[in-house]
Regions:
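Internal, well-folded beta-alpha domain core
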Residues: 38-42, 46-149
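Compact, well-ordered interaction domains used in eukaryotic information-processing assemblies
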Residues: 18-23, 41-45
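Domain-level signal for Mg2+-assisted phosphodiester chemistry and nucleotide/NA-binding surfaces
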Residues: 3, 29-30, 49
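Short, solvent-exposed secondary-structure capping/transition elements
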Residues: 21-26, 110
Length: 149
């Protein structure tokens, strides 16, 4: 069963809203090292979205998603420092994963996400792993949440 990692989902939602991610962390960490105080920091997307109430529902049959693997060579000579300069790359991905993501609209950030997805607007185009595996995001609507006892 392939589970959609919550932090990965927050990263995708943060990309839609234009929040900074892990690439900003290198700058933050190097600045803190220079100042002599290294404390824990999180990317902007996580700081802003960590409190969202989210449900992730797998839609593939029994939650099983097939995995594809591709192996290719990069033999330009400078790709690898090993003798011969041949870099063997093994890439793997999930084939046609499907999840239904439910977000409780109880805060401003959740409402921003709803508006962005509903209006097909995003700051950074979301993708799953590599930029040739774009996320196909559909807005399904708003439903009333009910408490179950």
């Amino acid at each position: 069963m392939a589970i959609f990692h919550r932090v990965a989902l927050l990263g995708i939602l943060g990309a839609i809203l234009g929040y900074k991610g892990y690439s900003q962390m290198q700058d933050i960490l190097s600045n803190k090292k220079k100042k002599g105080k290294l404390e824990s920091s999180y990317p902007e997307f996580y700081e802003k979205l960590k409190d969202l109430k989210i449900a992730i529902l797998p839609l593939n049959n029994k939650g099983i998603i097939s995995k594809k693997i591709q192996i290719f060579n990069n033999s330009v000579g400078y790709a690898s420092k090993e003798q011969g300069g041949n870099l063997i790359v093994k890439e793997q991905w999930l084939e046609n994963p499907k999840w239904e993501i439910c977000i409780l609209l109880d805060c401003e950030e959740a409402k921003k996400i709803k508006e962005a997805i509903q209006n097909h607007k995003c700051e950074f185009y979301p993708y799953l792993g590599t930029n040739d595996h774009f996320a196909d995001i559909e807005y399904l609507g708003v439903e009333e949440a009910k408490t179950i006892e």
